Curated annotation (Swiss-Prot):
Main location: membrane
Organism expressing this protein natively: Geobacter sulfurreducens (strain ATCC 51573 / DSM 12127 / PCA)
Designated name of the protein: NADH-quinone oxidoreductase subunit K 1
One GO MF term: NADH:ubiquinone reductase (non-electrogenic) activity
Keyword Cytoplasm listed: no
GO biological process per UniProt: ATP synthesis coupled electron transport
TM segment ranges: 4-24, 29-49, 60-80
Subcellular location: Cell inner membrane
Uppermost EC category: translocase
Originating gene: nuoK1
């Protein structure tokens, strides 16, 4: 059986990779994928702690996080498509050029 410590280490590594990706990359799709990776790392932590403590609350919270992530994915991809149609680029540096 895999220990709680191992799950938390994997979760921390995934979260760190996602954070580095958000800070370093300029492509909006890659940044979006890194944010999703960070959410999945948090979900892994919730599941591991829920299993370790014998409580189902963490697993229920993961379903809420997944629901919010799905809504975020829909809105984020719609914004990226609209931005691509406008600028023909998905570089986040180009977002600064847009005016309201």
């Amino acid at each position: 059986m895999v220990s709680l410590h191992s799950y938390l280490i994997v979760s921390a590594i995934l979260f760190s990779i996602g954070t580095i990706g958000v800070l370093v990359r300029r492509n909006a799709i890659v940044i979006f994928m890194c944010v999703e990776m960070m959410l999945n790392a948090v979900n892994l932590t919730f599941i591991a702690l829920s299993r370790h403590l014998g409580n189902i609350d963490g697993q229920i919270f993961v379903f809420f996080v997944m629901t919010v992530a799905a809504a975020e994915a829909a809105v984020g991809l719609a914004l990226m498509i609209a931005f691509y149609k406008n600028r023909e680029s998905i570089d986040v540096e180009d977002v600064k050029l847009m005016k309201l």
